[in-house]
A protein has these predicted regions:
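Structural recognition of the beta-strand scaffold that forms the well-ordered cores
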Residues: 25-28, 84-89, 112-115, 126-130, ...
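Catalytic metal-binding/acid-base residues of hydrolase active sites
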Residues: 32, 92, 178, 220-223, ...
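Metal-dependent phosphoester-hydrolase catalytic domains
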Residues: 204-214, 222-317
Length: 317
């Protein structure tokens, strides 16, 4: 009998994917410039220091830390189970990650950290937090992001980690794709290039073991219907179109229905994405597969609490 996996998209820059009879959650959470307060001379983090323009001090740091703890614990409280894998972006260093997993409400999750410093100018990285009691880590590696036409371009790495869940092989990637600086069309070639690179990694993994289930996540700075995902990653947008070895972008239908993870003007976008392999989408190998969220026609749902609403500033509402 196939076990089920359901995905919940939280529209607070995270996605939850659940496996097993009591679902496991896999989350992506954009931490939005989570810097420590210490000036690192090796990176451009002056803005987020007590002397910088944001006056980033210990009180502000601890407030953000508490908010992140509250969000992640609120997610765990849905079914009284901590997420098994949490991918994050825009975090400065391992010390910040250690502070997150040590918060009183998250410490019982006994999280381990997968993190490497990347060459990004401001020093922000991607990382994974994972529960070793469920995800059995076998390896991890930061892959340098390559833009062929810009050999000196430095950005966040593609962090990969692999292991097993219930004895089934899993391969995770988390990435923060190049921004839309200069405009979507002008910058699109960079995101397409990273999409192709991640597709190449996925193809190599599946060639070595077609039973491996792949989960890609991150801030892609593009919607699931954009070229970087449909052409760069080559992801399909409909479950019925999937064949062995394909990739599936499950949140295109939610975007078309008017949902999103961020709003610009009068339109919603889903820049925070997951893309998964066909065998995880359809359960064509093993016992783990996705399922629709309870009471939803989508592979997702909305997690929104009053304390997540920004009440002032440019992004209030």
């Amino acid at each position: 009998m196939k076990k089920q996996l359901f995905c919940t998209i939280f529209f607070v820059l995270l996605i939850s994917v659940c496996f097993g009879q009591k679902p496991y959650k896999v989350v992506f959470y954009n931490l939005e410039n989570f810097f420590d307060t210490i000036n690192d001379p090796e990176v451009k983090d002056d803005e987020f220091t007590p002397e910088g323009p944001k006056k980033w001090n210990t009180a502000k740091y601890n407030k953000k830390l508490g908010n992140i703890e509250r969000v992640l614990f609120g997610m765990a409280a849905i079914d009284k189970e901590y997420p098994i894998v949490i991918g994050v972006s825009e975090v400065e260093n391992r010390n910040v990650l250690e502070d997150i997993v040590a918060t009183p409400k998250l410490a019982p999750g006994n999280y381990r950290i997968s993190h490497f410093d990347s060459p990004e100018a401001r020093g922000v990285d991607v990382a994974f937090l994972y529960r070793p009691d469920v995800f059995k880590l076998e390896g991890q590696y930061p892959v340098k992001t390559v833009i062929p036409s810009l050999p000196d371009f430095k950005t966040r790495d593609i962090l990969t980690m692999w292991g097993t869940i219930e004895d089934e092989p899993f391969f995770f990637m988390v990435a923060h794709w190049p921004s839309r600086l200069g405009g979507k069309d002008v910058s699109e070639f960079k995101r397409i290039a990273v999409g192709r690179q991640m597709r190449s990694i996925a193809d190599s993994v599946l060639q070595a073991n077609p039973a491996t289930k792949i989960v890609m996540m991150g801030d892609f700075n593009d919607d699931p219907t954009d070229k970087s995902i449909t052409e760069g990653l080559g992801a399909k947008l409909k479950m019925k179109d999937l064949s062995a070895g394909d990739l599936y972008a499950p949140y295109a239908d939610m975007l078309k229905a008017g949902y999103g993870t961020l709003a610009y003007g009068d339109a919603w976008n889903i820049f925070d994405n997951i893309v998964i392999s066909e065998n995880l989408a359809k359960g064509s190998t093993g016992k783990l597969k996705i399922q629709k969220a309870p009471g939803s026609k989508f592979y997702g749902n909305i997690f929104k609490q009053h304390y997540m609403i920004q009440k002032e500033g440019q992004y209030k509402g």
